[in-house]
Regions:
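N-terminal anchoring/stem segment of glycosyltransferases
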Residues: 1-49, 53, 57-63, 154, ...
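Short, surface-exposed beta-edge/turn micro-motifs
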Residues: 2, 26, 89, 143-145
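A general structural signal for short secondary-structure junctions and capping/turn motifs
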Residues: 19-21, 55-57, 82-85, 136-139
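Core catalytic alpha/beta fold that binds nucleotide/phospho-ligands
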Residues: 30-38, 44-53, 74-85, 113-134
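Conserved beta-strand termini and adjacent loop/short-helix elements that scaffold enzyme active sites
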Residues: 31-33, 94-95, 191
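Short beta-strand-to-loop acidic/aromatic patch adjacent to the donor-nucleotide binding site
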Residues: 62-72
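Conserved donor-nucleotide/metal-binding helix-loop-beta segment in metal-dependent transferases, i.e.
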Residues: 73-113
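Catalytic core and acceptor-binding pocket of nucleotide-sugar-dependent glycosyltransferases
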Residues: 115-192
Length: 192
């Protein structure tokens, strides 16, 4: 089984930490503006491409493990644990908010009080449009900074759905993972 550990770091936004030796074999891929495709889109959206469309960039792997650029792996069993009992997609539940409705409300509340981090990434209009599109605030909220997924036609199509919606609504992908689970486009299980 071939495993790819993937992250993105454009404009040296994060300090990508060294990956400790793991208990399973893997290849590490860090995408930057130097090795990302040259698409006409914002850097923020372009940085989502390896996260969501990995199967086009690295088609010869069986499993992809995603980590945000700011995440530091400290355990030698990290990859072994996250791929253990993997169905299609494995993510942790969000540690602070339970549902995507909670997340939409949190983001909108923060944008209304001029949170600069959110205002430079999203628009209120697109957040509202995405919320109306999903139309189910009770879906579980996942923490999308770390996940594992299979490279299979079904899962790839599900991630292509997320990519397509990110292009329509901006780059707020977090609630879209819950939507593909609801639509049964991919089978999820949670990690801790």
């Amino acid at each position: 089984m071939k495993i790819a550990l993937i992250t993105v770091n454009t404009d040296n936004f994060d300090d990508v930490m060294p990956i400790p030796k793991q208990s399973v074999d893997f290849d590490f891929h860090c995408f930057t503006e130097n090795n990302l495709p040259k698409f006409e889109m914002s850097k923020r959206l372009l940085s989502k491409y390896p996260k969501l469309m990995t199967h086009y960039l690295l088609p010869d792997y069986d499993i992809y493990v995603w980590i945000d650029g700011s995440i530091e792996i400290t355990s030698e069993f990290f990859i072994e644990e996250i791929i253990k009992d993997l169905r299609d997609v494995k993510m942790a539940k969000h540690p602070e908010r339970q549902t995507i409705g909670d997340e939409f409300n949190f983001v909108l509340d923060q944008m209304h009080v001029d949170n600069p981090y959110l205002l430079e990434r999203y628009t209120i209009e697109n957040i509202v449009r995405e919320s109306l599109f999903i139309n189910d605030g009770n879906l579980p909220l996942y923490a999308c900074g770390i996940f594992a997924r299979r490279n299979s036609p079904e899962v790839n199509r599900a991630f292509e759905q997320i990519w397509g919606q990110c292009q329509i609504f901006g780059n707020f992908d977090q609630p879209l993972f819950s939507l593909i689970e609801k639509l049964r486009l991919a089978r999820f299980n949670s990690s801790s």
